[in-house]
């Protein structure tokens, strides 16, 4: 994402926009028929049959999955795959990213993004999915936007400010607190707490997060007080 914003500034300056794409009720709305088509196209016949048998056994009806299993996560990645190709190859949007049901396109023209948004809306509708009316929107790069746990903002001078979303920090603090309670109760090893924090810290360190990480280091010390 940071690379796209820097490239947008080099090509067109700081006044560009981003189209944020979010699918409403994504996993609950995925059609089983579409999932089967995607897996059948990508997998050998014997593998496809096993995958379909598992999904058919676990999920009755024609739509909807629980996103907990790895197989369903793969379905979540694969279902919009033709739309990815449509956006990159037909619309020629060269600054496009998607993870599961969250996508983003960076472009210098708001009007172009408005046209693309309607075209993308129709593509999702064709496979039974609806774009979220509130979360799918166009924002100015200088105003900032949330994507994948970070808040991004492009300054007039072309610097990309990338900070951890406060919602992400709050969620992680709660997760660490619960883990610390389990460690104190002897139900989890101390290493589980360290590993969780190391993983999150590596992610947060990708942004402008020095002060935040300093505060989180102190928070970890507080959680570990009294733990041998």
Task: Kindly give the residue locations of the regions a language model identified.
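Right-hand nucleic-acid polymerase module
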Residues: 21, 57-61, 66, 85, ...
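Conserved polymerase palm-domain catalytic core
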Residues: 3-100, 105-119, 123, 129, ...
